Amino acid sequence: MAGYSCKKSNQINPDSNLKLSFSADTVLFDTVFTSLGSATQELKIYNTHSDDLKISSIRLVGGEDSPFRFNLDGESAIEIYDKVIPAEDSLFSFLRVTINPNDLNSPFVVEDELEFITNGNTQTIKLLAWGQNANYIVADKVVNIGGTLYPYHIVADSLQTTVWTSERPYVIYGYALINSYGTLRIEKGTQIYCHQGGGILSWSDGQLIIDGTAEEPVIVQGDRLEAYYNDTPGQWEQILMMDGRAGADHRISHAIIRNGTIGINCQSVLKATECALRIDNTVVENQSGYGLFSILYAVEAKNFVIANCGFANLWAFGGDYRFVHGTIANYWNANEHNNNENAVLVANYALDGNNQPFYYPFRMEMDNCIIYGKQKDEFKGVFGPEADSIYTFDHCLIKSEKYNGTMPGFSHCLFNLEPFFSDPIKPDCHIDSIASPVIGMGNPLFGNEVPYDLDGVSRIGTPDMGAYQYMYGR
């Protein structure tokens, strides 16, 4: 179907400076289908100029495979040629999408573009629909943080507690924002799929609680379901936590966070002494940037794996950190770039916008941990004298040519001994050989503090280093 208003026809003007205008730059079909169905939206195309314009082609970029169709002059099409819009006139196009939410191969976010070529100019309109029966969190506002624009939708407003359950998956388009003094609690078994460029954002004084279990972890990953994307990093942005508040620690328990850019990004600007994050029984893997990125936070992590990141697995400037029974392993093997950073990079100073250092006290304790990877040195500390820097390693395996067990801060540590991970590229950081030097070499005091490994296997008495106990035949 198409409609024109009645204007006097003019000569077609081929001037490349003349372009079309549209009623929208994105057409959103916001219906969430529970069964096979279709929806229709309207797009208005304007010629605001005093001469006629010829549109050389209008086409769906996705072609025959696109679930979208558009309708002009009563004809449903994927491509139309040589359509004229008279001067100061408009054209109506009707767009339709057909969705089968029961098709497990259907993506959560269905996208295409409607392309217009006029006088050599290519203009596109984004088409967007929801492909499965899920809870969709769609950005409707934008906030500027340090010069970066973050599109967001508030999921937990001030003084509000919002609970996400496992009944249906959550798909985040943009950022799901926790407002100041709001709380988002994510229950066991919840599946969260983040679209490109999106994630979860806890605003200053907000609180995020991820409350999974060993049997039903919370999973946060990208929204592409094709097999090719199972291990593709950088599909979504991050879990970002701004300044926290006293008595409202962020907590992440029994979670799997994979295939993003920064798995967990916690940054304090104003209230470093009140910003706390507690992590347990959690895996952060396959991030194109950092696994855990922290500025002036207090982080305690137990029974955790941070594996295979494009930059450092753990990057921390200032703050207070304690890690118990963690495996930090970087065997990055993706195609974007070669990773030349250390698995753990920590500092008590950073450079400001004028390239001048500013300092903040740093303290870190690592107990019964493994730090290993492909680099010669997988731990690097960058410290200046203007602020305190204290770090201790107790019963840890570390890959390093710079540090050794005779140096201050290292107690009962092993260096440069192959840990024998099952498949570090995959990554699978279980220990699969009785020859591994980490077996039985943990401090029992720390083992008693975390009596079961990431798989629920007891480590009481003779704990291994790292997140997993060795089990013969596993």
Residues covered by each model-derived region:
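Surface-exposed binding patches on compact interaction domains or structured appendages
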Residues: 7-28, 48-96, 101
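C-terminal accessory segments
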Residues: 412-474
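Right-handed parallel beta-helix/beta-spiral solenoid domain characteristic of secreted/periplasmic
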Residues: 136-140, 208-244, 337
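Predominantly extracellular beta-rich ligand-binding scaffolds that present long acidic/polar faces
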Residues: 294, 299-430
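Buried hydrophobic-core signal for structured, non-transmembrane domains
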Residues: 40-47, 95, 110-118, 239, ...
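Feature marks extracellular polysaccharide-active and adherence modules
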Residues: 165, 173, 179, 187, ...
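C-terminal motif of bacterial Sec signal peptides marking the signal peptidase cleavage site
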Residues: 3-5
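Terminal connector regions
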Residues: 9-10, 101-133
